């Protein structure tokens, strides 16, 4: 029929062309004809017009012209009437087409409905037949299975001894007749089997399994069917619900039993000590005795830190060694295990040189000895017969590009044989390295009884300059020796000084030390012209009158000179308002270092090294000098060097390679 049924109907009734298209063509023709007629009428009117002037006698002429003019108006009205008639015809045609289309569509719908109805009936017939055949087949199969089961079970029941005894004693003929009559009572109503008979009769091909029994047999087909229908196995309510214990319940029971057992175990463990020792004194003792065991286990896990272990051992062993030295019991000292390297180093009991040399050898043989040093600071202790020897080393590196700080605290308590006091070695190394700058101060303190040796090294290398300052303090009683050396050299020439040699020990015998101390202190006192300081060759006591003045003079220049050029002890710059004035520097330097004032007039610009006159052995060992005198000497030396720095930096600017610039 197509998408537009109206066109189909029009083509069916009027032919190939639709009436709508014909009416359109007609209307277009009418319009074109009207236009042509109007044009013709206008041209005729124009041709009829006269050029001559009007005459009086010819009065009816205008009327004729008026009639000719009005005539086209009447023609237009007639044309409008024709168009309206044509429009009415088109509307009637459209209405007729709509009616025809509606009737045709209703006819098609009714026909489709009939076909669908017939298809549904046909499907019901076919499906019903298939369902019936399937139902018969299933019924026959189930019937045969149930009959076979009934035969087997009946045979087993009859063959059993219990059934035979029951039949002999309790079963009688009357009872069997009553039972048979009750079971076969449904045979009177044949209507119960009508549906089954019809179902079986409709399909002769699907025959069930037939096992012939007599009517009196309880396992015959009819009797079995009666019993089966009475039980109503197919209904859901007739089924007996099975009461089974699932495995989950057993698991839950087992889990509960395990949980109860676990709950009982800690209760038993808690009840045992309380039950055995109920409220008595020993019970409390045992309860308290059990508590530390748990704490000991925790402490054992926490005591794996090597720092704590070794520090505790060091403190414990040092206490034992001190108590042994005071009480004089050699048994406690023998219990400690000395290292083999320290045994080799302890040569004699009485000589002090041997003790000091053994201490120095111990420094060198640290990697070979049992004293193991690790960079995070580990404490190891080695004890021999005698006093204590403690070495503490700390290294600190500060780099501007990559700051690396390594602190090493090393304490090794070594009790040497024949030592009267405590030998303490304190070494501190601090390295502050910028890109080309390296500063390494070192101090070493050796105390023999009350003797202390302190040495500090500072290395400041600029582009090609290296400065090393060394100080030695040897204190005998109250006597302190302190020396400082500074050396500068340009054009990348490194200078190094060994403060303490292996074989040349700064501590001599008592007799030799006394002679050297007396000789050197007298020379130094005369050279420095320290009238207010009185040096004693034996005890090194200072006069009480000039003590405060010498302390002020010794400390003030050191503090001012170390702050020279805006630098503090740590090398950091201080603000300008905290820096000392030029007048104070000049006054202090003039009082403290008069003999080095002439060094400022040098022309070459290079820094000059000022050092004290060395003795015959090449070492500065003014051990008999008092600490105040040594501070004054240090202040004078530093003041002169700072003056030289300021002079050379202001004198020659071009000698950049030879100047010492403190850099961060």
From Swiss-Prot:
Keywords from UniProt, A to Z, are: Calmodulin-binding, Cytoplasm, Cytoskeleton, Nucleus, Repeat
Show where the record puts the motif Nuclear localization signal 1.
Answer: 251-258
Q: Which domain of life is it from?
A: Eukaryota
Composition-biased stretches, type Low complexity, lie in 51-64, 339-353
Bias (Basic and acidic residues):
76-85, 305-315, 358-367, 427-447, 502-532, 652-664
What InterPro entries does this protein's entry cite? DUF4005, IQ_motif_EF-hand-BS
- Write out the coiled-coil annotation as residue ranges: none
Record's subcellular location: Nucleus; Cytoplasm, Cytoskeleton
Q: Polar residues bias located where?
A: 536-547
Q: Which PROSITE patterns match?
A: IQ
Q: Which Pfam families match?
A: DUF4005, IQ
Motif Nuclear localization signal 2: which residue numbers?
A: 351-358
Name all IQ domain ranges.
93-121, 122-140, 144-170
The entry describes its oligomerization and partners as: Binds to multiple calmodulin (CaM) in the presence of Ca(2+) and CaM-like proteins.
Q: What is this protein called in UniProt? A: Protein IQ-DOMAIN 28
Protein's organism: Arabidopsis thaliana
């Amino acid at each position: 029929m197509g998408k537009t049924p109206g066109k189909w109907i029009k083509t069916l009734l009027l032919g190939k062309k639709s009436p709508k298209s014909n009416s359109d063509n007609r209307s277009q023709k009418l319009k074109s004809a009207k236009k042509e007629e109007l044009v013709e009428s206008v041209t005729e009117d124009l041709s009829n017009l006269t050029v001559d002037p009007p005459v009086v006698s010819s009065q009816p002429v205008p009327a004729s012209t008026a009639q000719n003019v009005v005539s086209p108006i009447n023609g237009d009205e007639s044309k409008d009437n024709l168009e309206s008639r044509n429009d009415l015809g088109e509307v009637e045609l459209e209405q007729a087409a709509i009616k025809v289309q509606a009737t045709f569509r209703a006819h098609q719908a009714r026909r489709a409905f009939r076909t669908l109805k017939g298809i549904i009936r046909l499907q019901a017939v076919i499906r019903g037949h298939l369902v019936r055949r399937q139902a018969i087949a299933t019924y026959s199969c189930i019937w045969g299975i149930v009959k076979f089961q009934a035969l087997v079970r009946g045979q087993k029941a009859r063959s059993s001894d219990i059934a035979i005894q029951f039949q002999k004693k309790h079963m009688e003929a009357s009872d069997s007749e009553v039972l048979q009559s009750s079971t076969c009572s449904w045979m009177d109503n044949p209507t119960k089997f009508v549906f089954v008979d019809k179902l079986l009769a409709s399909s002769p091909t699907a025959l069930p399994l037939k096992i012939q029994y007599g009517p009196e047999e309880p396992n015959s087909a009819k009797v079995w069917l009666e019993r089966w229908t009475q039980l109503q196995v197919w209904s859901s309510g007739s089924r007996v619900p099975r009461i089974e214990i699932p495995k989950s319940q057993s698991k839950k029971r087992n889990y509960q039993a395990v949980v109860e057992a676990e709950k009982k175990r800690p209760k038993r463990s808690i009840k045992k000590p309380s039950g055995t020792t109920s409220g008595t004194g020993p019970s409390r003792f045992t309860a308290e005795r059990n508590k530390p065991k748990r704490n000991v286990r925790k402490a054992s896990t926490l005591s794996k830190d090597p720092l704590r272990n070794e520090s505790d051992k060091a403190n414990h062993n040092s206490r034992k060694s001190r108590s042994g030295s005071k009480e004089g019991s050699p048994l406690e000292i023998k219990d400690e295990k000395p290292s083999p390297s320290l045994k080799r180093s302890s040569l004699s009991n009485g000589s002090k040189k041997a003790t000091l040399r053994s201490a120095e050898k111990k420094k060198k043989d640290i990697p070979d000895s049992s004293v193991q040093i690790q960079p995070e600071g580990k404490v190891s202790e080695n004890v021999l017969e005698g006093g204590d020897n403690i070495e503490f080393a700390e290294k600190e590196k500060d780099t501007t590009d990559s700051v690396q700080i390594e602190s090493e605290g090393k304490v090794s308590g070594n009790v040497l044989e024949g030592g009267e006091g405590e030998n303490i070695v304190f070494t501190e190394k601090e390295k502050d390295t910028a890109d080309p700058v390296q500063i390494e101060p070192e101090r070493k303190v050796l105390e023999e009884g009350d003797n202390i040796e302190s040495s500090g090294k500072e290395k400041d290398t600029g582009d090609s300059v290296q400065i090393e300052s060394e100080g030695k303090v040897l204190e005998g009683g109250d006597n302190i020796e302190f020396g400082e050396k500074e050396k500068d050299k340009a054009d990348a020439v490194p200078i190094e000084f060994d403060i303490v040699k292996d074989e040349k020990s700064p501590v001599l015998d008592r007799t030799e030390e006394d002679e050297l101390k007396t000789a050197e202190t007298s020379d130094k006192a005369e050279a420095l012209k320290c009238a207010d300081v009185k040096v004693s060759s034996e005890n090194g006591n200072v006069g009480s009158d000039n003590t405060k003045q010498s302390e002020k003079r010794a400390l003030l220049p050191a503090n001012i000179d170390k702050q020279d050029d805006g630098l503090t002890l740590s090398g950091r710059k201080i603000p300008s308002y905290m820096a000392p004035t030029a007048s104070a520097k000049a006054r202090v330097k003039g009082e403290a270092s008069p003999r080095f004032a002439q060094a400022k007039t040098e022309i070459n610009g290079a820094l000059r090294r000022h050092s004290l006159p060395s003795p015959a052995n090449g070492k500065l060992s003014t051990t008999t000098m008092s600490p105040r005198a040594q501070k004054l000497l240090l202040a004078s030396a530093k003041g002169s060097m700072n003056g030289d720095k300021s002079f050379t930096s202001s004198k020659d600017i071009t000698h950049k390679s030879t100047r010492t610039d403190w850099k961060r």
